[in-house]
Amino acid sequence: MDVDHLRRLHAVDTERPGAWIRRRRRTITGEQVVLSAAVLGTLRLLLDARAERRLPHLSERLGHVVRTNSEAILGAATPKVTTDFSRGVAITSSIHPDAVTHIEPVRYGRGSNAMGLLATILVGPGRLPRPLRFAIAAATHPRTFLQSLSVRRWSERTVILLVMQSLDNSLRIMLRGNRRGPHLRSTQGHGEPNPTYLPIGHRAARLAAEAIGGVPGGSLNESILDIPITAHILGGCCIGDGPGTGVIDAYQRVFGHPGLHVCDGSAVSANLGVNPSLTITAMTERAMSLWPNRGEADPRPPLGEPYRRIAAVPPRTPAVPAGAPAALRAGSAGAV
C-alpha cells in the first residue's frame, strides 16, 4: 500500500496468493480504501507501510492494546464415539458462571479434526513450572496422554469449551527484523498480564468431561509453553480522539492519511468476553452508514476534528429492496 499525497490517491498492490508463477500482479488506485485484513493482516500491512515510509503518518499507537478476549480454549473428549458431538449447529448456547466469564460449547463438523493437533491433557495449577507439571501428568497418566495424541474422529468425540473474559489485559504487537526478515513480535501491554490459567474454565472442562464420560483437555500452548491461545485476537488499531491516543477516529478513518479506513477486528479496543463477530459487523455497518452518497457533501467532521453525532445517510439506490426484511427503515437510521 502506498499513498500519493498530491492527488490524495492510495495505491494497493495485489497478486494471486500462494502463486509461484503467474502471480497476476496489478496496482489498484482509489481515493478511498477500506482495510479489512483481520487483525494480524491489518497490523502487518500497516506496520510494514509505516516502517518503509509508505504511510509515514500512521500513529505511534499502532499495535498497542491488542486484545486476546482473555481467552482459553479447553474441552472434553471421549475415548470412543459414544455420542456424535459433531452433529448440530456449531454454537447454540452459553453460560455466564460469574460476572466476567462467558463459556460457549462449540462443535466442529465431522472430519474437521485438524484442531485436535493443538489439544492435549489438562494441566492444572501448582508450584512447579508448567512444562514440568505437564511431563509429570503425561508420565502418571500415560493412557490418557496417548489417547490425547489421536485425532481420529476427534470432532465426533469432542466438546470444545471457549472460555472468554471481559478483563482488562492486552498485548503490544511490534515489527521486528532479523536475518529472515521482518516479523511480528508481541510483548505484554496495558493492564493485567494475559492469563495462561483460568480456574473457572478448568472446572468447567472437568464438569463437561464428567457429564459425557470423557477426559478434560487443554491446548498445547497453555499446557506445555504456559502461553495463552485465542480464537479472537482484537485491537491494535484502536479508536482515539487523535493520533496520540488512537490509530483511527470514531468514524474509523485513519489519522494522518485521509481516505484510508480500518473496518475489522483491529478497531475493537476491549476484551468483549463474547464472540466478537457481531460487534465487528455492527461497528463496520455503523461506519459505512455515515459515508456520503457519491457527489453529496460528507456529513462527518474533517479528519482530526472533535467527534459529533450525525444521522446515518440513507442510500440513494439501496441494494436491499424497500420491502425486504433487511431493508433500511426510518427507525434504524438515527444519529450515531
Which role does the model predict for each range below?
Residues T92, R180, L220-T230, P301-R309:
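A glycine-rich phosphate-binding loop feature that marks nucleotide/adenosyl-phosphate handling sites
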Residues S59-H183, H190, I233, F255, ...:
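FAD cofactor-binding and catalytic pocket of flavoenzymes
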Residues M1, V159-L162, L184-A270:
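A glycine-rich dinucleotide-binding beta-alpha-beta segment and adjacent secondary-structure elements
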Residues H257, N271-V336:
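In a subset of proteins, long, contiguous C-terminal domains/tails are tracked
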Residues M1-R8:
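Feature captures the FAD/FMN-dependent oxidoreductase FAD-binding
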Residues L43-L45, D84-F85, R172-I173, V247-D249, ...:
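Short helix/loop capping segments that flank catalytic or ligand/cofactor-binding pockets
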Residues G63-R67, T196-G214, S289, A297, ...:
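Extended C-terminal subregions enriched in glycine
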Residues V3, D13-S93, D264, S277-P302:
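Glycine-rich loop(s) and the adjacent beta-strand/alpha-helix scaffold that form part
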